[in-house]
Amino acid sequence: MRDYEVQPQHVTPEVQAWVRAQAALGHTAPTILKALRKSGWLADVAREVMAETLQAPSGVPVPRPAIGAALRLDAGDRQVDVLMQMSQPHIVVFGNLLSDDECDALMQAARPRLSRSLTVAVKTGGEELNDDRTSRGMFFTRGENELVSRIEARIARLLDWPLENGEGLQVLQYLPGAEYKPHHDYFDPAEPGTASILERGGQRVGTLILYLGEPEAGGATVFPDIGLEVVPQRGHAVFFSYDQPDASTLTLHGGAPVLAGEKWVATKWLREHEFT
């Protein structure tokens, strides 16, 4: 059998012109990315094409951990492992962010306060039930107790983002069958309720999902636009940022259905400015 050498792929003016043409026709960044992958472009090269061709100059500053080539980061009171990172979209998977005792303490404190999870009501700026989200959850106020304060300070140092720009820590419980269908965390400027939401700290620019309890099966955090699934591992976390409220950030994500056992997570959303 003859061995064939795999030819390297490079970003060319021709493929960039094609991407610009597709964007001009109104196709979204996720749709263009999927078309590149379907036509044979490798995932990392396709993302590079998108990043170089559809740069968005209107983006705002976002949390961005100073990782470089480091395998672990100093988060103040804890050394946190860097397990995976990518640049487009900006995603980092952290290990050892929380101890087992901290995971247990958060779940124990949250359990008696759980209720059916709500989502932002985009028409009014309030909250509402949404069939896309079937978890139970609660919010700690920022700095509510020593445990929450300690974890929030660790997150602020790890992500190099002001502590006061974070929303309160949310804890969620997913029972078998529970899920959160793919969505974006930023607030859509086209919705009538967004203006009032932004008064409390501006746009969301980053999300950190911390895994407190592992299910027996299912429950991955999925990023459909880039074909990534992050398996929930106790004490680990996944972080991603988005510099504009647009699908071109490729941060569409969701929580796959839990097939067996329970999944517990804590979510920290980060705003442009101080969250009040």
What kind of feature is each model-predicted range?
Residues 1-239, 243-276:
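Fe(II)/2-oxoglutarate oxygenase catalytic core
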